[in-house]
Amino acid sequence: NLLRSFHQEYPNILITCSRCDTDMLAAGLLNGDYDMIFTWDSTNILLEDQVCHRLVERVPLIVALYAGHPLSGRHTLNRMELKGEQILYMSPSGVGDSFGDSHFMELYRKAGYQPDILFRSSDAESILMMVAAEEGISILPAYVTNKLKDADNLVFVPLVGEEEYEEIIAVWKSDNAGQALQKFVLRIRGAE
């Protein structure tokens, strides 16, 4: 774990974590509220001249289903097999019409259909509660469900396909000369 190993090496540097949607994270970074953010680029922040970034992780996507769903016994699914399902859509953004949303809508288009989106939110917990209540299914990044064991009425099936992943990137302002940030950036570059 990158954060843990950095903290162990530099225990006097406080790493604080905030969980927000991608729009708030990007705005916070550009406004100087954060030294660095870990995000998926749904805001197109990488087009900003004043930022640097590194790929941290490529996370596979999974399909969250309720236990009684006809597809819940499958070992893998592809996006085409989800046609006609009511989708509880986890948006990377609070605005619902972001660069990231456009990317995922394009994946549905390539699969041959427009998704039937029943609900849209950037809050994974709300979406999982609705899936467990059998209101629909959802596609989520695997990090949302990796630690869930014995989740009541939830089944997670890997989504297969060439583009069925999410890239997590570390982003920081190039003009931030803070010593702690520079040490962390070196750690990230060393992890490549």
What does each model-identified segment do?
Residues 40, 85-111, 178-182:
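Secondary-structure junction motif
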Residues 40-48, 102, 107-110, 124-154:
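A ligand-binding cleft/hinge motif common to bilobed small-molecule-binding domains
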Residues 155-192:
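A late-sequence structural motif
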Residues 1-46, 121:
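Central regulatory/effector-binding core of bacterial HTH transcription factors
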Residues 28-30, 82, 129-135, 170:
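Hydrophobic residues within well-ordered alpha-helices
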Residues 50-61, 65-87, 182:
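Flexible hinge/capping segments at coil-to-helix
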Residues 2-11, 33, 98-114:
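Ligand-binding cleft/hinge of the Venus flytrap
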Residues 51-62, 142-145, 150-164:
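Short beta-strand->loop
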